[in-house]
Amino acid sequence: MKLEVLPLDQKTFSAYGDVIETQERDFFHINNGLVERYHDLAKVEVLEQDRTLISINRAQPAAMPIVVHELERHPLGTQAFVPMNGEAFVVIVALGDDKPELSTLRAFISNGRQGVNYHRNVWHHPLFAWQTVTDFLTVDRGGSDNCDVESIPTHELCFA
């Protein structure tokens, strides 16, 4: 099956998480007016007594064509990825309680200046780079037992 890749924007992505970007976002000045602060762009959630981690993930480009056959989710915390090199990247998401609901399966491509924050329990494809090795600033929950993985029927990404 083919899965069309759509441009990433907050309106179409909102059911799955937050788009982390400055475009069309409010800000206020700090540091004597030298800095524009784009405040509270994503809601970071960590359940239980675990802590929030900030890491850098270096992702390798996916083999082409990009084929999706499994999704994962994190029930105990959100997970954010922000590309550090200005590279566009692809995110693949779905809703669903026990298993991904294929009717909600979507693929998006960022513009290189956007990151994403997946809501808790949102099914998504494991992180990969699109065209070149990419470093991602990653914010997520520390601790174990926070990853469910499900196989899905194979979908091939279709770039419009």
Curated annotation (Swiss-Prot):
Its EC number is 4.3.2.3. Pfam families: Ureidogly_lyase (PF04115). GO terms for molecular function: ureidoglycolate hydrolase activity; ureidoglycolate lyase activity. Keywords: Lyase, Purine metabolism. It catalyses: (S)-ureidoglycolate = urea + glyoxylate. Gene3D superfamilies: Ureidoglycolate hydrolase. Pathway: Nitrogen metabolism; (S)-allantoin degradation. It is an enzyme of class 4 (lyase). Its cofactor is Ni(2+). InterPro entries: RmlC_Cupin_sf, UAH_cupin, Ureidogly_lyase, Ureidogly_lyase_bac, Ureidoglycolate_lyase_dom_sf. The keyword Lyase applies. GO terms for biological process: allantoin catabolic process; purine nucleobase catabolic process. Signal peptide: none annotated. Belongs to the ureidoglycolate lyase family. Homodimer. NCBIfam families: PRK03606.1-1 (NF002948), PRK13395.1 (NF009932). HAMAP family: Ureidogly_lyase (MF_00616). Catalyzes the catabolism of the allantoin degradation intermediate (S)-ureidoglycolate, generating urea and glyoxylate. Involved in the utilization of allantoin as nitrogen source. This is Ureidoglycolate lyase.
